[in-house]
Amino acid sequence: MNFILNNEQRKVLGLESVQENWTTINLKNQMIVFLDNKTIVKVIEYSETEYTEYQLSEIIDEDGLILPKTNKGKPKKLSYSSVQSCHKIGIYFKYETKAWVNYAMIGNHTTQKTFYSTNFEEINIDTFEKFSAWLHEWQKNFSEKDFFELETFKNETRHNIDIKEGDFFVFKVDKTNFGFGRVLLNIRKLKKDKNIIGHYGLLSLMGQPLAIKIYHKINPSKNINLSELKQ
């Protein structure tokens, strides 16, 4: 994929602009590393089927080695794999098209949240031409309200949430509408309390799995009377 976002496109995707004083290093496996003095601040990964742009904050020394975050760590040679293993921060953008999946997504590595994904709207962008058309429309229709919401999302901090069964939650289904759901089971708690008698595949789930239900309700505001969902 012979394509790199420009700064005007980055603005409507929440990404940091590339500055004129930054230097670039091209690594194997189609990766571009951007340096602000001695700090890696941005990375672009690209291939025939994928484009990803994300932020880092990693310092390199005079020999071009990535310095460790702690005294126990060791400097790492600047390479495709070492950059990929670095702790990603802030906003990222990803476009991927393969035989079984195609999507564009704006997310936040710091908060582990998604601002927008074409998957929610089932938009087909399985070719670069369709992706370019989608990006053009996204940029053309990007409003001041969208910019404010994206900046708010960009500056959010991560919160630990004590999830309880019966909790309601809200999620974006597109740029202007929200969907709603409810937590039915906290599977992690069931495993911890040893309340799962059979296996049923639940013991193999990774992360913090939840059983949820999604309501057939879309609303332009995340604020909704819960009685409407319970009907």
Segment roles from a protein language model:
Residues 1-122:
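N-terminal intrinsically disordered, low-complexity, charge/repeat-rich segments that act as generic
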Residues 1-25, 176-195, 200, 204-206, ...:
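Extended hydrophobic/aromatic-rich secondary-structure runs
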Residues 87-89, 93-95, 101, 188, ...:
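A short beta-strand signature
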Residues 126-207:
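Short N-terminal edge-element motif at the start of the domain
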Residues 213-231:
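Intrinsically disordered, low-complexity, charged/polar segments
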